[in-house]
Each structure stands twice: as structure tokens, then as C-alpha cells.
């Protein structure tokens, strides 16, 4: 009788242990599945984009709004190539627009689709040009926060340089900065809607050395070349 009771107890203990193991296995499988799903979500590549630079520019314009989008002058290919120094054989297509009075309104939108391996070079060239724009507004402070908030994006073979949005009229620098931030948020959202991921701004603001842009421009009243100015 004692042996029978001992056998029953042992059987019950084994069954309980097996049930616990089964439950743990199920929990581990669930956790593994959840982890795998989360990893897959994180590693999902951005959705393929087939838009042309002109179509992307139209999305940016729509995000800003007709009233505040004042890039109304096309930069022709010859001027575009000579001013910026791009190798045009490496650019599949592009759109380049600015305001007709560039000396006062710095608004500029450049969208390019380049060939493989040229995107970073294009970014570097645009940053060199941006350094000049920053130097200019430090000498002649028009739309300072709009310029300092400029966007320079690179996604695959697409490169974009954007100074755009509503212009602040007043002398409150804090309010000017708030307006610029709000306008560029619209541009960031438009870019994210196109490419499926938050953009990373590659624009580099040069250090202010107190000499109007680090010696980029003379300190006198000499004319400063500005496209469209």
C-alpha cells in the first residue's frame, strides 16, 4: 500500500513538473516571437521612393503653403553647375529654386537625385555653400533663424537643401526662432511622409567667430555675389 501511495505521489510530481516545463516553453516561444516581430519592425527598410525631384519639391511646397513658399525663380543648369560646382554628369535630375531677391530673401530649395556614390559629395558641396549663406546673414541679418534652421537631407540617392517657410517680421529673436522651428517641422514631416522615416539634418552651422562668417566676406561694403540678388 505504501509503495502504491509513493508511486502515485511520484507520478503526480512528474506530471506537475512536465506541465510547468510546457508552460515555460510556451512563454519562451511567445517572448521569442514578440522579440522577433519587434526586430523585424525595426529592421524594415524604408519604403521605395520613385518620385522625381520635381514631385518631391511639390510636396515640400504644399507642406509650407502657397502663401509662404516664395521660391519663385528657377536656377538654370549652367548657373547651378557653376555656382555650386556640381559634377552634372553625376546628377540624374534636379530642381533648384530661389527667391528673385536673394539678397533679402534667402529662400532656396534644391532637390536632386544623384548617381550611386555621389550623394555624400553633393552634401559636402551644399554645406560649403551653406557656410557662405550663414556668413552673409551674420553680416546682413535678414531672416537669421530661417537660414540657421536650413535643412540638408540625404536619403539614398536623394539629396535636398531647403531654406523655406514663413518669414518673421519683427525684432523678437525668440519668436523668430519659434516660427522657424514650426515651419521646418512641416518640412520634416513632409520628408518623413515621402521616405517613411524621420530625416536627419546634415546642415552644418559654422562657428561664429565674430567676423561676419569667418572671413568668407570682406569687412567693407563690397558687393557680395548672391544668386538672384
Model-derived regions: residue spans:
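Mature, Sec-exported extracytoplasmic domains of Gram-positive
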Residues: 24-229
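Positively charged n-region of N-terminal signal peptides that target proteins for export
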Residues: 1-4, 8-9
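N-terminal targeting and processing segments of secreted/endomembrane and organelle-targeted proteins
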Residues: 13, 23-24
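C-terminal motif of bacterial Sec signal peptides marking the signal peptidase cleavage site
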Residues: 16-20
Amino acid at each position: 500500500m505504501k509503495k502504491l501511495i509513493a508511486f502515485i505521489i511520484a507520478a503526480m510530481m512528474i506530471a506537475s513538473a512536465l506541465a510547468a516545463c510546457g508552460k515555460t516553453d510556451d512563454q519562451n516561444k511567445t517572448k521569442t516571437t514578440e522579440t522577433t516581430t519587434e526586430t523585424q519592425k525595426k529592421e524594415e527598410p524604408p519604403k521605395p521612393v520613385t518620385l522625381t525631384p520635381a514631385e518631391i519639391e511639390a510636396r515640400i511646397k504644399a507642406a509650407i503653403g502657397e502663401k509662404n513658399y516664395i521660391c519663385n525663380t528657377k536656377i538654370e543648369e549652367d548657373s547651378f553647375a557653376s555656382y555650386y560646382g556640381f559634377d552634372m554628369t553625376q546628377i540624374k535630375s534636379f530642381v533648384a529654386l530661389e527667391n528673385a531677391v536673394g539678397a533679402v530673401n534667402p529662400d532656396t530649395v534644391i532637390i536632386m537625385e544623384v548617381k550611386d556614390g555621389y550623394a555624400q559629395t553633393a552634401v559636402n558641396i551644399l554645406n560649403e555653400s551653406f557656410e557662405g549663406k550663414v556668413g552673409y546673414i551674420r553680416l546682413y541679418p535678414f531672416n537669421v533663424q530661417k537660414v540657421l534652421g536650413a535643412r540638408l537631407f540625404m536619403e539614398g540617392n536623394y539629396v535636398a537643401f531647403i531654406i523655406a517657410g514663413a518669414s518673421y517680421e519683427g525684432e523678437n529673436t525668440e519668436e523668430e526662432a519659434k516660427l522657424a522651428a514650426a515651419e521646418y517641422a512641416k518640412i520634416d514631416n513632409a520628408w518623413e511622409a515621402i521616405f517613411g522615416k524621420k530625416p536627419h539634418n546634415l546642415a552644418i552651422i559654422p562657428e561664429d567667430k565674430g567676423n561676419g562668417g569667418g572671413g568668407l566676406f570682406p569687412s567693407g561694403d563690397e558687393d557680395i555675389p548672391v544668386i538672384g540678388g
